[in-house]
Every structure is written in C-alpha cells, then in structure tokens.
Regions:
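Non-heme di-metal
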Residues: 1-165
C-alpha cells in the first residue's frame, strides 16, 4: 500500500480527551516506576531516578489540571490523527520489572527509551493540536522531554563509556 493521501485517511482518529487520558496514565506510571525504583538503584544514579520521579509528577499534575478546566471541554472533543508514535508511547504504560538491584546501564537505557517515546509523542501532538493551552502544554512537554533525553544521554555516555558500569 502506498502512503499517499488515501493512507492518511485510513489512520484512526482519536480525541484530545483520549490523548490527555493516555498521557496522564503515562506520566503516572512513570512517576510510580521511578519512585519504586529509586531505593533499588546504585547511589551513583539514585539522584537521577529521584529527579525523574519528581518531573513525572509535575507532568502528571499539569495533565490533571488541564482535564479539570471547564473552558477546554469543547477542545477536548476535537478529533486528531492518532500519532505514529502513539503505540510506542502507550506501550510505555506497561513498565518492566528490573529486579531488586538493577544495573545502572539497564536503568538508563530504559529511561532513555521512555524519554524518547514521550518526546516523539508530545512533538507529534504539538503539530496536530489547535492553538491554545493544550497545544502550549504539548510544546512545553516536548521541550522538557527533549532536554531530559539529552541529559540522560550525556550521563549514560559518562557512566557507561567511562567504565562506571
């Protein structure tokens, strides 16, 4: 099947309400995962995992506040194309069991994958969401997740490639 205009019309649609619900769950599971993981990781990266839990809590709070806004009820019913990144993003709601003593490299690899999935999803949503507070939120989160991913990549390189793991 060629990927022309016909293919684009076959893509399933979703509402911004559904997007908001999935994103809220994504951030909640990330927060819980990192909070549970923090005492199990090495001291070398514990601060990173604790920061990730705090950041995910902030993102969760932002989504919950958006969901409560009366002025967004109509906007939340807007249909948009489901982003290509949606499946990968949704899959991240299911978190792995990294055991009681996960190694730093495994933790950082997982965190990088999650941040990358979030960055792609929020960027795609930014491009498809009408101007307004929800679009502004997706723009903010796309930038935040990009920043987190870059910071994690630098730390990963420092720890893994300097013999820290």
């Amino acid at each position: 099947m060629t990927r022309g205009h016909g293919y684009d019309r076959l893509k399933p649609l979703t509402t911004l309400q559904e997007v908001l619900e999935v994103a809220t769950e994504f951030e909640r599971t990330a927060r819980d995962f990192y909070a549970d993981l923090a005492p199990k990781v090495s001291k070398q990266i514990r601060y990173v995992v604790e920061e990730l839990a705090e950041e995910e809590q902030q993102h969760f709070d932002l989504f919950k506040e958006m969901a409560k806004r009366q002025d967004l009820e109509r906007v939340l019913q807007t249909e948009i194309e489901r982003p290509v990144s949606d499946r990968k993003f949704s899959d991240c709601i299911h978190v792995p069991d990294l055991g009681d003593k996960p190694d730093d490299q495994t933790v950082l690899q997982y965190a990088l994958m999650r941040e990358h999935a979030a960055m792609e999803q929020y960027q795609a949503l930014l491009n498809d969401t009408p101007a307004g507070p929800l679009r502004d939120l997706f723009e903010f989160l796309a930038n935040e997740e990009t920043k987190h991913k870059n910071e994690l990549e630098a730390l990963y390189y420092e720890i893994v490639h300097s013999g820290g793991v």
